Amino acid sequence: MNILIVSQYFYPENFRINDFAQEFQSREHKVTILTGTPNYPGGDYYEGYGAFKKNRESYEGIEIFRSPLIPRGSGSSVRLALNYISFIFGSIFTSFFLLNKKFDIIFVFEPSPITVCLPAIFIKKIKNIPICFWVLDLWPESVVSAGNLKTGIIPKILNPLVKFIYTNSDKILVSSRGFINSIVEKGINKNKVDFFPQWAEPIFKPVKPDKNNLDFIPQNSFKIMFAGNIGEAQDFSSIIEAAIILKAKKNIHWVILGGGRKEDWVKAEIKKNKLENCFHIMGSYPLEEMPEFYAQADCMLFSLKKEYIFSITIPAKVQTYLACAKPIVAMIDGEAAKLIDDAQAGLSCPSESPELLAENITRLSTLGKNELDKLGQNALNYYNNEFERTMLMDRMESIFNKMTD
């Protein structure tokens, strides 16, 4: 099968689509990528790349066509808009170099923005091939929520655009069941919308650490670890509030891996509230080092603010926590909270509930090793039953086969 993947992001940027493309290439399909010039997350072109530099290359036998775009820069609203729009036009331009190639299907990877599908629709119309659209970020809900734009011109522009994209997609896969109703309510046939979750990369599995990365924390402490973006959506104000509540419990330590727009604010709050002895910002590390860090934590944390879009979202980090057999403590509403409960992998409380988060952490910190290990084993069992990579890849291959029969 000849598969054209359209994704604004691809290697050397670190996204799950890299793993997907390599897997399908290894299954003896011919994979071609239409993507942008790498600039995520730093906001500048990666070394060796430019708008019209290194636009054609090969990675693991996969042919890559890179479109020129304006890098995202500091991530301001204006710069992101320019980044998204320039990818649309740059990819349509670049797609002319693909028109002499044979493709059986177009697979669109959408962590955001949804407009990544527009170049795919352009190619579909010319070559008459089906589009399978994998939606990881629900538009317009996510952008409206993030920008507090529930009224005004932005929703009026986005709503018909989103409907156009969904209408022109032959199959829509969603990473959370909560997305389905929202898409169907836009007038889309429910029969072409299916749940297809994210998986954890193969490196995420239970491991024994080779070294102690947390040797600055007393040995018998209870370590809560957060890995990922330190942003507005993750509600670090409530996490800090929970840390303040637990400040007197000297055995509880918070370990934060990652970075983001709120990192400086979090550091200032740590200093302001004298949390330096228990709240540790460690910065970002390569993805391949994450399982070893996870192995040194007693439980893994994730949280999202109280917004409708977040209540129907399952953050990708959840699968990595489950795959590494880690107990989970979460401050989240809706789909992700239900997942933790169904898996019996830890404790959850509603979004923006620092007091309840503190209570749940206290409860977990009093459990013995065997009880924590049981939660971790529940997490791994649930992952293997619901999100295991090979199982999902087989299912995707079956979807592609049905679409191309």
Regions found by a protein language model. Name each.
Residues 1-60, 248:
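N-terminal subdomain of nucleotide-sugar transferases
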Residues 170, 278, 294-311, 326:
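Acidic donor-binding loop of glycosyltransferase active sites
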